[in-house]
């Protein structure tokens, strides 16, 4: 028996487009550009996921369709999602002094509106 070669898994970079449409009837035309994740019938928009390298070319093609009002790119991959250093950790409240770091601990209590 031959040993099977294992391929290393690489995470595919993906991004979503929000496509605002005039009507939802020709919705099947959008399937060729990516995975349709959500359709809002009330607000008339479609969320499509596709590979990152195809975003710019597909945005131009989708925008030229007759039933498309506008196309917006999702900025979620660009937003820093690590909030551990922002709120409630010791690293967020370090102040540098002459002899090193002094940690100033602050109370980070979250109160709900119904308990106030």
Swiss-Prot record:
Chain ranges passing through the membrane: none
The keyword Oxidoreductase is annotated on this UniProt entry: no
Disulfide-bonded cysteines: none
A GO cellular component entry from the record: cytoplasm
Subcellular location, principal: cytoplasm
Source organism, top-level taxon: Bacteria
Keyword terms, alphabetized: Cytoplasm
InterPro entries from the UniProt entry: DUF2129
Pfam families named in the record: DUF2129 (PF09902)
Keyword Cytoplasm on entry: yes
Localization per Swiss-Prot or TrEMBL: Cytoplasm
Family: Belongs to the UPF0298 family.
HAMAP family: UPF0298
Protein's name in the database: UPF0298 protein EF_2453
Lineage: Bacteria, Bacillati, Bacillota, Bacilli, Lactobacillales
